[in-house]
C-alpha cells in the first residue's frame, strides 16, 4: 500500500473506532506517538483508540491533505476535529491542524509522530490559561530533550 492510502486507512480506522484496523497499518514493533496521550506500541493501539480517543471524544473528522512519501518516510498535513466528552468541555468542538510524520518499513508505519498546533483546539475546548501553560511546558520539555534541538539552544 502506498503512503497516501496507508495514512488514510490508519486515520479513518481511528475515526470509526476501529483500533485493530489502525494497528494493522503498523509494522511489528511500530509505535504511535500521540501528542496528548503518549506512546503506544502496535499491540496497544486498539486500547488507545477505545480507551482514550473514543472515551474522551466523539464525532471525529480527520482530513488528510498533501500526503507525500517514499519507502522510508511519509508526511501528511491534516485537520482533525471532534466533539469533547471530557468534564468541563462536554459537547464543545475542538479543531486542530498538524503534520503527521511516519517512518516506514515495507509499506507499514514503524513510527507515527506529529507536529500539531494544539493550543487552538484546546482553547476551543475552554481550557484555562494555567492548563494550557502546563501542556505547553510539557511540549517544551519534549522538544528541548531531543538531540537534534541541542545545537539550537546554545553553543
Descriptions of predicted regions:
Residues 1-15, 108-110, 116-155:
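Terminal "cap-and-tail" regions of soluble proteins that handle hydrophobic small molecules
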Residues 60-62, 93-100:
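Short, surface-exposed coil-to-beta transition loops
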Residues 55-58, 82-94:
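Short, cysteine-centered beta-strand-loop-beta hairpins and adjacent loop/turn segments enriched
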Residues 10, 22-23, 30, 45, ...:
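Hydrophobic pocket/interface hotspot
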Residues 71-82:
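A short hydrophobic beta-strand element
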Residues 26, 80-82, 102, 116:
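Short beta-strand segments enriched in hydrophobic/aromatic residues
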Residues 19-73:
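A solvent-exposed, acidic/Ser-Thr-rich amphipathic alpha-helical stretch
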Residues 43, 72, 90-96:
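A generic structural micro-feature
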Amino acid at each position: 500500500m502506498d503512503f497516501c492510502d496507508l495514512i488514510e486507512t490508519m486515520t479513518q480506522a481511528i475515526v470509526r473506532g476501529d483500533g485493530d484496523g489502525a494497528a494493522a497499518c503498523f509494522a511489528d514493533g511500530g509505535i504511535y506517538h500521540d501528542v496528548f496521550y503518549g506512546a503506544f506500541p502496535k499491540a496497544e493501539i486498539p486500547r488507545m483508540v477505545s480507551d482514550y480517543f473514543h472515551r474522551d471524544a466523539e464525532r471525529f473528522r480527520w482530513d488528510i491533505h498533501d500526503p507525500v512519501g517514499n519507502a522510508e518516510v511519509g508526511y501528511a498535513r491534516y485537520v482533525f476535529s471532534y466533539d469533547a466528552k471530557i468534564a468541563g468541555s462536554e459537547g464543545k468542538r475542538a479543531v486542530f491542524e498538524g503534520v503527521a510524520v511516519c517512518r516506514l518499513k515495507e509499506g507499514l508505519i514503524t513510527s507515527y509522530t506529529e507536529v500539531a498546533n494544539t493550543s487552538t483546539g484546546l482553547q476551543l475546548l475552554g481550557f484555562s490559561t494555567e492548563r494550557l501553560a502546563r501542556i505547553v511546558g510539557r511540549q517544551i520539555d519534549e522538544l528541548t530533550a531531543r538531540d537534534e534541538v541541542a545545537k539550537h539552544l546554545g553553543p
